[in-house]
Amino acid sequence: MSSIKIRSKRLKESTQIRILIAHPMEHGNNQDKITHQLIPAHFIRILTVTCNQKVVVSCEMGDSTPKDPYLAFMLKHGKTGDKITVNWLDNLGNIDSEEHIIN
């Protein structure tokens, strides 16, 4: 099951895209409450959003991004039937991807 949830809402001449990613986003400075050992860094490094295979958002995230990041933006000219794809890569080499059709 994907860690990514995508929602879209058509407005007059644009589409609102909302993305929620379930990810720990650990920066590596927190201690485990039981063992008092540092929790290793684990965060999303690169996030890419495409619409019909054309990149519309590409960003580098880091260890200061909070747990379970939420992103929202307006997509000009997004129309019903367009395919939104979200991909991420984290610092441990894990990847995830999810597709969504604008309704």
Predicted regions located by residue number:
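Short acidic/polar inter-strand loop motif in beta-rich domains
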Residues: 88-98
